[in-house]
Amino acid sequence: MRAVVQRVKRGKVTVDGQVVSEIGPGLVALVGIRQGDGERECRYLAEKLVNLRIFEDGKGKFNYSVKDVGGEILVVSNFTVYGDTRKGRRPSFTEAAPPEVAREVFERFLDILKEQEVSVKSGIFQATMEVEIINDGPVTVIVEI
């Protein structure tokens, strides 16, 4: 699994002109599922997102997690984070899990994340989404297992 994680002031997902999810301060995670990902990867990524210290203390040091600051997490499935651009001009997505497998793993990941005592919202799997992100910092990290 791979997640592009951004600290945000707010985030919103719109599908077909309808807002389906919206958060205030917290994290937006664009999550890709790789072939072979399962329970272990879901648990690792959920724990990492909730406890990742990328929120600043009073001295400007990254000492707080989204859980510590009472923030929310908006999770968006996104197979393109597994785009391999090393050859040619068109990304290859052969590492990404096929949709029927990825959907099951993504839903399990959301279930585990929702057990973590933090507000979790998500986009719609395999939908064409408009994702509005107001990045805070900007702070953007990649988490991979």
From Swiss-Prot:
GO terms for cellular component: cytoplasm. Pfam families: Tyr_Deacylase. It is found in: Cytoplasm. It catalyses: glycyl-tRNA(Ala) + H2O = tRNA(Ala) + glycine + H(+); a D-aminoacyl-tRNA + H2O = a tRNA + a D-alpha-amino acid + H(+). GO terms for molecular function: D-tyrosyl-tRNA(Tyr) deacylase activity; Gly-tRNA(Ala) deacylase activity; Ser(Gly)-tRNA(Ala) hydrolase activity; tRNA binding. One of its GO terms (biological process) is D-amino acid catabolic process. InterPro entries: Daa-tRNA_deacyls_DTD, DTD-like_sf. Keywords: Cytoplasm, Hydrolase, RNA-binding, tRNA-binding. Its EC number is 3.1.1.96. An aminoacyl-tRNA editing enzyme that deacylates mischarged D-aminoacyl-tRNAs. Also deacylates mischarged glycyl-tRNA(Ala), protecting cells against glycine mischarging by AlaRS. Acts via tRNA-based rather than protein-based catalysis; rejects L-amino acids rather than detecting D-amino acids in the active site. By recycling D-aminoacyl-tRNA to D-amino acids and free tRNA molecules, this enzyme counteracts the toxicity associated with the formation of D-aminoacyl-tRNA entities in vivo and helps enforce protein L-homochirality. Belongs to the DTD family. A Gly-cisPro motif from one monomer fits into the active site of the other monomer to allow specific chiral rejection of L-amino acids. This is D-aminoacyl-tRNA deacylase. It comes from Carboxydothermus hydrogenoformans (strain ATCC BAA-161 / DSM 6008 / Z-2901).
